[in-house]
């Protein structure tokens, strides 16, 4: 199979195809796509959990790429209408790399896929080696949403460890669905995170709201003002951005915590909000 007309209903497959040099195959994208910027000129055919089916069909795709159970209803409807659908379900760093391999094979550029994966693995190895020189690996709370508080998304937890931190709720990474990763704010207090990182699914992180949570004034990250924001496009898409820009931003945060400079080759293109 070598799909020539592809609709990507999430950003990470769009970005992957661009990195593989196969962007001309893309005929439709999610309206939430921001990476790469030039992809925004493609026809927008969906949000995240709903899609414009007639618009998709009018594009005559030979493949539609979806993600996880969250887009299962979209996938089912497209299949009923005779469209070929491939649903990815990558939740870990290894699975993200597998997704890139798979997509490269589908479009007939397996060697480019291997090179891209090798480049990302090399970058993460360099960050892990750099992090090994930190005097302290801070305890880290990552928030993917604020009300309710949701934490522990697997690939982010793994990237935190690569970048030099220690997740305070490591057990949550094995829960695939967000409702299973809801955290009682009171349960955070005894964990005493030294760093809090917010990435609230496209909404700007309100640091004052974090500081004002009941009992959180006793938390080290709040007392010492180690509260940071990483925009969701860099970290919450399970794709190339998280394994490059996202992990570099995490590394920059932990270097800042340790009062250390980041090696210029590991410095992110966009700095997190510190």
Across the structure, where does each feature detected by a protein language model lie?
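N-terminal ligand-binding lobe of clamshell/alpha-beta domains
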Residues: 1-274
């Amino acid at each position: 199979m070598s799909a020539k007309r592809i609709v990507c209903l999430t950003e990470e497959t769009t970005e992957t195809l661009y990195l593989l040099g196969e962007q001309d195959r893309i005929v439709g994208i999610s309206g939430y796509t921001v990476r790469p910027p030039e992809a925004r000129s493609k026809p927008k055919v969906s949000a995240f959990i709903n899609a414009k089916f007639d618009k998709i069909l009018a594009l005559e795709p030979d493949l539609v790429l979806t993600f996880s159970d969250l887009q299962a209803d979209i996938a089912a409807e497209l299949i009923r209408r005779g469209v070929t659908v491939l649903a990815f379900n990558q939740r870990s760093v290894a699975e993200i790399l597998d997704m890139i391999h798979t997509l490269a094979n589908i479009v007939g550029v397996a060697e480019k896929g291997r090179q891209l994966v090798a480049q990302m693995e090399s970058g993460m190895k360099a960050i892990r080696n750099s992090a090994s020189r930190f005097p302290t690996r801070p305890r880290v709370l990552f928030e993917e949403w604020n009300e309710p508080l949701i934490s522990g998304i697997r690939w982010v937890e793994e990237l935190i460890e690569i970048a030099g931190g220690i997740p305070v709720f490591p057990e949550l990474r094995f829960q695939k669905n967000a409702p299973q990763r809801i955290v009682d704010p009171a349960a955070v207090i005894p964990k005493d995170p030294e760093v809090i990182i917010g990435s609230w699914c496209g909404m700007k992180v309100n640091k004052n709201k974090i500081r004002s949570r009941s009992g959180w004034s006793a938390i080290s990250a709040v007392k010492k003002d180690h509260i940071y924001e990483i925009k969701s496009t860099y970290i919450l898409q399970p794709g190339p951005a998280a394994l490059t820009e996202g992990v570099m931003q995490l590394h920059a945060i932990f270097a800042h915590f340790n009062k250390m400079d980041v090696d210029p080759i590991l410095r992110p293109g966009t700095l997190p909000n510190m």
